[in-house]
Amino acid sequence: MFHAYYDEYCYLPVHLYEGESGKLITTLLRPGRRMRGREATAILKRVLDHLTMVWPKTKITLRGDSHFSTPEVHDLCDGYGIDFILGQAINSKLKALGEPLMELAAALAEQTDEPVRLFDRFEYQAKSWPRPHQIIYKAEITKGKANPRFVVTNIRNRTPEFLYEKIYCARGRSEGFIKNHKTYLQSDRTSCHRFSANQFRLFLHSAAYVLLHTIQQIGMRGTQWTTSNFDTIQRRMLKVGARVREQATKVRFHFSTSYPLKDLMRTVVFNLNTS
């Protein structure tokens, strides 16, 4: 489908990760258009049904960009009793509501000649929302330029600053997960003619993500490599010459005696075998 913003035909896949560990929950291929509320809830409902069945006492927080900020998703989260904190697209009404705080931030920045970041919260109801929701507003002046940000959430027992900086901004880690998946594993290679074929390719890339993530987080546990990206792991550890011997019950890999990461490889194999 043609996407006017990107000025080309493209897909816009959905990536869902566990926000602390980076474990992949699911990836689904989508047409290149903005996600509708019913589409988002159909995906999230299947995930939440499974999570709440397996871990009924686990507290779940949905964190995402503004594509997920729809009344259907808000109602879904409230229905499941889970927290949500989602980016909210800026519009003229939100901009007007945040203007007094932005003017204060601009005045403070002019006085101190330093970047200023202020926070506030207020109730807001878009035309498509059946009821108002809490908006967290960040008014920031950096290098003389305004940088407003809005977030919608149902979490009320935290300060606006904490909600934005400690909870919402932590979604930046998910960008690293997506980069590992899309860039380093090249999961954006969707050049097949059929949609189903491209979805299958995405599943294969997702399987590769799970494999490398397991090596990174379990195999490399206790080493400095747990924070390395997938590109570094592939180039330095895996893309090396080796002799492969297939036997009746096992496959043996013979590395060169000068292989520089022998100790790391032993650690990875030991950790994977004992986990």
Where are these predicted regions, by residue range?
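Active-site-proximal, Lys/Arg-enriched surface segment
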Residues: 1-16
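Gly-rich Lys/Arg/Thr-decorated short loops/hinges at beta-loop-alpha junctions or inter-strand turns
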Residues: 20-32
